[in-house]
Every structure is written in C-alpha cells, then in structure tokens.
Amino acid sequence: MRTFVRIVEAGSLSAAARQLATTQATVSRRLQSLETMLGVRLILRTTHTTRLTDDGERCYQHARRVIDSWLALEDEVGQTEDEPVGVLRVRAPHAFGQDQLLKPVTEFLQRYPQLSIEWMLNDRSADFLGDNLDCAIRVGVEVDPATVSVLLAEVPRSVVASPALLARFPAVTTPEDLQQFPWIAISSFYQRHVELFHDASPATARIAITPRLSTDSLYVARNTALTGLGVAVVSSWTVQDDIQEGRLVHLLPEWQPAALPVHLVYPWSRYYPARLRRFLELMRQVMPEVTGMRKPVQQP
C-alpha cells in the first residue's frame, strides 16, 4: 500500500523506485500484487505517463488516510516525548536556503538524531505530490487553497541603482522619475510595474517600468544592478553592504516596495508527523531573527 501511495505521489514507477531506494521492477511487482489482491486496475501505464483509474483514485484516498493514521499511531506509541523521526523533505528558496537557514537547520538535526532532512533549493511554487515534499518555505503571497500557509516573517525591499547609471539621467526626486530608467525585473515579484508606499503617509505610487533584463534570481538582479544595467527592487539585506560602500544607491528611501511575506507551506492533512510539527515550531522561532528578515507588520 505504501508503494502504491508513493507511485501516485512521485508521479511514476521510476521516481517511486528512486525515492524508495529500490528497483523499478520491485515497485512494479508490488503494484501488481496489490491490484491482484483487490481485483481491479489501479494505474493505467503507457510508455511516457501513468494515471489513476477511478478505482485507483478511491484506493489512493483510503490508503493515504490509513497511512496517516498509522504514522500517528507510531508517533503516539513509539515516541513518548513526541520526538521527530524519519525523513523531512523541505524546499527552500535559494537566497536564504544556502546560507542564513543552514545554522538553525543544522542545530535542529543535532537536537534530533533520529531525524534526517532532504534540503532542496528551488524558487518555484512547490508541487507537494509530484516532488514528494513535506513542506516548503516560500517568499511571496501563497494563494493555493489546498495548502496551509503559516506566516513566519517578512523581507524588506529597496529600490537601488549604480552611481554610473544615475549619472546618465536627471536626479531622482519623485517616484515618477523612476520611469525614465531601464529596469531589471525579478519575474516572480514584478515585471511591468512597481508599486511603492510612502513611509509617512498613506500615499502610494504605481510606476510603469521597461525591463532590459528579467530574471527569477535575486542574485542576478543585484549583480546586474551593480554593472549599471538598470534599476532594481531587491531584498534589502542583499545590497546593504553595496549601499554602505557606495557601489549602489538607495533611491527614494522614504518610498518603499511592500515587504515580501515568508510562509511555511504544507499540504492539508488530518495528521501531521512530529518532524513537521517540530520544524514548524523551529521556523516560527528563528525566521524573524534570520538576517534580512523581520517580524511581520500587523495588518489593521
């Protein structure tokens, strides 16, 4: 049954075999045994795809509940102190996942010796079933109603440009002046316009921009801004030293882009294992203190 569930959630027999550390032939035999025992075809297979039959869909829903219940029993009976065990599969953004979050994650693993973590860096939205993920740390607004999103922190942002670029244009004194510049867009967060908020009044400004370069990488945006290619909106922590040392200029500091929310996201379930619950507790505790983040501003 667990093999069948893993096939469904991994998306193919070969992917399930890799995750289970076994051969595709073994996975296929287990699936055939389950289908023979139930007397129905659960998965339709072609050379390139697999898909659930109607019976397979019903079987998967029941099997998922049975496995969740069994895991809950294991936690309750086998771990009297609710200590996390097993493997936690986490997706984190490149910018934070390769640096600032490593220390708390390492300490977390040292605290729980029976736990392992698969720490995968990717800035795309999480496909929990296809990638077999337990949770994901996401920067930006989450709108998937099938998931639980826990707000952990927020990331302040700044508008920056190089002195060489600024020397080619009239001085910037209002948000509208930014429209004259070439731009570097971070496609995950802004592409054709930038919205700014005044820090001492309710005033807002929506600026149309013309990107010379669009990227999904925060580091690419920062590095190309340093070359003078264009103006960019970036996470403030990535350019703090550049601003202090004069490599970049913080434009209109009284006008700020909205800070980006940081969530821990995971699929809704009737049961959450101790490893996920403890990791959520850790992230709630450490995330607002991570370099470049702050506690979320309470909304009115």
Regions found by a protein language model. Name each.
Residues 6-21:
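Short helix-boundary/capping micro-motifs
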Residues 85-148, 296-300:
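Central regulatory/effector-binding core of bacterial HTH transcription factors
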Residues 47-50, 54-57, 68-91, 297:
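Short helix-loop hinge/linker segments at domain boundaries
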Residues 35-52, 248:
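A short LG(V/I)-centered, amphipathic sequence patch enriched
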